[in-house]
Structures are given as structure tokens and as C-alpha cells.
Amino acid sequence: MAYMCTDSGNLMAIAQQVIKQKQQQEQQQQQHHQDHQIFGINPLSLNPWPNTSLGFGLSGSAFPDPFQVTGGGDSNDPGFPFPNLDHHHATTTGGGFRLSDFGGGTGGGEFESDEWMETLISGGDSVADGPDCDTWHDNPDYVIYGPDPFDTYPSRLSVQPSDLNRVIDTSSPLPPPTLWPPSSPLSIPPLTHESPTKEDPETNDSEDDDFDLEPPLLKAIYDCARISDSDPNEASKTLLQIRESVSELGDPTERVAFYFTEALSNRLSPNSPATSSSSSSTEDLILSYKTLNDACPYSKFAHLTANQAILEATEKSNKIHIVDFGIVQGIQWPALLQALATRTSGKPTQIRVSGIPAPSLGESPEPSLIATGNRLRDFAKVLDLNFDFIPILTPIHLLNGSSFRVDPDEVLAVNFMLQLYKLLDETPTIVDTALRLAKSLNPRVVTLGEYEVSLNRVGFANRVKNALQFYSAVFESLEPNLGRDSEERVRVERELFGRRISGLIGPEKTGIHRERMEEKEQWRVLMENAGFESVKLSNYAVSQAKILLWNYNYSNLYSIVESKPGFISLAWNDLPLLTLSSWR
């Protein structure tokens, strides 16, 4: 369903249309359920291609949204608080994205991200198995919180094979890495050896003795972290006492305390055996992401908002080139392709995606990039789009302007979706190099998505404090749709968040990458130092993000928060967790 209006006074008509469609969806779901009962159909037998005429990746009625709004309401329902729909973008770009493009609708011919994941489930062993292709660790496409692996959905582990085996074809040889001579000289702005940031907030390694985090259980963990280096014996004794009050099956506070206690214990006793599993199957990881994606709006918010910025920046362009830093499975792009295929100004004559593999793909990313390119090409073919996917196999630290083919008549977009934080270190040199490379390509728009928490330029105790606040909100946000007795929730928390918590406060070992994240203010400094200026997201993009929360009937504790110069954050209980921005 398209949320678009030709004049700002039509919001009530939109609301009426929404209510009417939802009533129709309820009737369809009831009939669908009756059919299952009559014919003995197993609703958990997943068939990604319910309507063969639609091709793969296009949703039919067999995939109703598990969290769609129920109940009706009259036409005077005041609960549609989106007065800022941007008339320009609604009429020029075709209204942006349909919420169904992100799994919120059941109409035929629309991209369903869950189907995309389910196709990976059926054919995942052809893409991402093996020790050299750890696709799901630190995966920006499949993980909204911590790109660590997760494990869930026992009832769906037995899935039927699908036609994805013909889509993911790793038998075709990978073309050798191509170095394209740039159409015009591309020079990367030189790195300066002076202070890498302007207005750089001062790093404060002193610990906050007045930390007042509630409840007391989390304060006790923070106090333990403060003395973990100076008095490890006392810290260990304190952890033993804390263990009596924590549980991975308790309330959100008890659960987050459980994982922090485990991580601190491992830090104090690095030779002790790990208490959680060290590996998960590819299928489990995909299913776990699906659980998180169904229950929480993080992935949908990030992709929807970034794609809208790209759609608006390229609204009249015939040739579009997207450079994606850190692509894995490409889940972000089908919805954008569908929006481009249906825009009112007509289809682009050419769309190209240059995919730079995420570090999580390991030293041999070729099979995953081939599979991603095949899926996207076949999806674009269904939409009758002239599409090409170019794998960029050069390591990110060796990339330069000649690594990309940039035609002079192309409009270029650069996408950093939950990727740059992986390049953070004690100094911002690597991040600065990547940003200056992006700037040298002269993009029309750069989209940046990052987690909203400071875990980099702070001392250990403050890192624990910030992480406690962040993950307390994350664990609470799972509760509305993943209940206290949910096995799926336990596995997502253990395999995803537990691993990430361990990575940010666990043992300091050589060769282990420390989890580092930064808040939006530091990203602003880094972007501006590289020569970018902020582009405020349109009123339509902001309203669309709010509609996303409303459409899926997520908890009212989720909110969209705007901040200067052009940031938009998804928050839980007023605490920003994930921030998107647009630059040029």
C-alpha cells in the first residue's frame, strides 16, 4: 500500500484507506486460517514463492505480517499523527516507499523482506557455510543491533526447499577484480597529521562516581566494573553475589545483568570456559534475524530512511550508481529497486550497485558476493530494470578512485549502513580514509546509519555504563513482541546481544577486535572533517518513519527523534538507539 498524498489535507482520507485495507486484511487472514484448518495446511511450512507469476521476492498473500495492526476504528480516528507529509516528495517521487515494501502489506507484487530471508534459509548452504565465510558475524544487512550471530525459531528449522537453489548459483566463475580507469581524475583529499577532528569532544577517561543508573542491580555491575582492574578479587566476589539475582529467563533487567555478569567474569577469568555456545548454523542465524526483524522496527527503520534519502536524491536521474560499503546479503536494495521501478518520473535506464564486502565475509567473500549479485539481478529482471551488480574485491584499506567505474552521466550515492563503526580504533584514521575516498567519488548523497552509543573514546567503566544503558533499552524493546517465555527471545539475546556484550567488555586479548561505537555528534565531526555537509532529511522521510511505527503497531515506547543538523534516531523510551543521516 502506498502512503502518499497529492495534498496535505488528505491525511484523513489516507487514514480511512488504511483502516479499510486493514479490515480487508483481517478478513483475508481469517479465510486463510480457515483454509489451513480445512485442508490441513501447515502454516509453518514456508514457501517463498506462493504465487509463481510474481517471481521470487515478490510477496503474495501467503505472507501476512505477523504484527499488523488489528482492530478497526472509525474514520475520525485521531491516531494518525503525521501532519508533515511532504507534498513535493509525495508527488514527485511517487510517495516514496510503500510500507508493504518492508513487510507491512499483503498485496501482490510487492517486495517482502521476510520472503527474501526465507529464500536464504532454503538456499543458505550454497552461500554462507564454512569457516571462511562467516556471513552472519558483524553483518550489517542481517543484524540491526549487533552484527553477531543469533539463533532462534525452533519451530521453523524444518523448511521446505525452494527455487533459491537456482538463484544462488555459486558454480559460475567470479570475474577477476576489475580496476576501471576513472572517467575523470579522482583525488582523495589528503589526510592531515594534525588533530583528526574539529570541535572534537574531549575524551574523558575519568569514571563517573555519581552514576545513578536504576535499578540497583545494574549499578552493582557498574561498581564491579570500576574495580575490576584495581581489585579483581573483590570484583570477582561481588560478581558471585550478583549471579544469584540474574537470569537469562528473568525480566529485562535480570537478563541484561546476566550477560554483563558473564562478560565481566570472563574478563576477570579469561581462561575459564565460555558459558554460551560459540557457533551457530547459518540457517539459525537467518531465522534469528527474522525473529528480530519481525519483533522490532530497527532494520526496517534503517533501510526505509536511507532508501528514501537515495530515492529523493536521484528522483529524476536516468543512470544511478550506488556504492555500498559493507554489503552482505543485499536486503536493503530490493525495496529501493521496486520504488525506482514504479516512480512517477519513469524507470531509470540503468542502475548499478558496486558492493564492497563487509569484513564479516572473511578473506574469501566471492561466493557471498556472487549470490547477492545473482539475487539482485534476478529481482531487478522481474521488475524490468536494467541492473548490474559489481563486486569490489579490493580490501577497503587499498581502495582508491580507480577501484570504481564511475561514468560521468551517473548520479552516485554512497551507503554506509552500520559499517563505519567497525573501522573505529584508537584513532579515526581508517574511518577518515574511507570517508575521504567516498568524498572523492563526488556522490550526490551519502547515507550513514550507526548505533547511538559511545563505546570508543571512553575508559572501561564508562564503557560499561554506556553499554548498560544502551542494552537495557534494547532488552526492554524486545519484551512487547517476544514474551518472557519466548525461546526465540532467549536465543536472540544470547547469540546476538550476549556475544556483542562479551566483545565490548570481555577479556583483552591480542587479535580480538574490540567492539567500538560512537554517538552521532562524533560522526558529525568525522563527516565534516572529510568535507561533507549535512542534508536534512525531508519531512516526508521523517513522517514515513513515524508511519512505520504506527503501521506495525509497535509499542508506543518507540519514537522518532530529530536532532541537528539533520539526524533522525529511532528511540526506545526516549533513548536513541539507532541514528540515520544524509550528507553530500
From Swiss-Prot:
Q: What is its main location?
A: nucleus
This protein's GO CC annotations: nucleus
Using the UniProt annotation, give all residue ranges assigned to the region (SAW): 506-584
Q: Where is this region: VHIID?
A: 289-355
In which tissues is this gene expressed? Expressed in leaves, sepals, filaments of stamen, and in the central cylinder of the elongation zone in root.
Domain (GRAS) spans 204-584
Which residue ranges does the record annotate as region Disordered?
Answer: 166-213
Spans of biased composition, class Pro residues?
173-188
Question: Spans of biased composition, class Acidic residues?
Answer: 202-213
Where do the segments described as Leucine repeat II (LRII) lie? 371-403
Record motif LXXLL motif, residues? 420-424
GO terms classed as biological process: regulation of DNA-templated transcription
User: Would I find Transcription regulation among this entry's keywords?
Assistant: yes
Region (Leucine repeat I (LRI)), start-end ranges:
211-270
The source's domain of life comes to Eukaryota
| Segments carrying motif VHIID | 320-324
The family line of this record is: Belongs to the GRAS family.
Q: What does this protein do?
A: Probable transcription factor involved in plant development.
Q: What is this protein called?
A: Scarecrow-like protein 4
Source species:
Arabidopsis thaliana
Cite the source lineage. Eukaryota, Viridiplantae, Streptophyta, Embryophyta, Tracheophyta
